[in-house]
Amino acid sequence: MKGIDHIHAQTYHGRKGPVKNDFSYAIDYVLIDLNRSVSLPTLFSHNSFNLFSLYDLDHGGMPKQGQGLRWVQEILQAQDLPGQERILLLAQPRTLGHVFNPVSFWLCFDQQDHLRVVIAEVGNTFGQRHSYLCHRDNFAPIAAQDKISAQKIFHVSPFQPTHGDYQFQFDIQSELIDISIEYLREGGGLLATLVGPRQPLTN
């Protein structure tokens, strides 16, 4: 990855339980290393208006109050977590200033380029956001088959109660992104996936 990648993905949402529903649609994400100075395409900007843009205010903390990369670095340092060598942000960009980013991911890699920690920022229609710190219990590199649990502490879907757990899977390859989030509770739950090829972002 030399600059910024574009992921033209498909996302799927399937609700389990008494109220069943599922749908899928195409969605565009970008994957960027905010700690590197890279040459950005003409139609894409960081922290300035453009056709497509990424603002630190949208990521790394509460909506419209984000601190971007610094927020992630402080979390990793405060908890002495691995993965501080390279941190990538996977997120939906703004389009003509409009932002809709229900979930974004901070992917944290070690010196050997192994994925060690992921911070998932999940928002809902009420303007709330919560962050889920994902890593293996022994802090070993995260593999595609690993299922990593985290507790859900507020409503994301109006049809889902606040009790239950999130289970994450991350398959981050040089040519493909494949992420799944499963909400588990007695009598129901929710499955969401994000899958798409990685390609350099160009004009």
Label each residue range with its predicted role.
Residues 1-203:
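Mature, function-bearing regions of proteins
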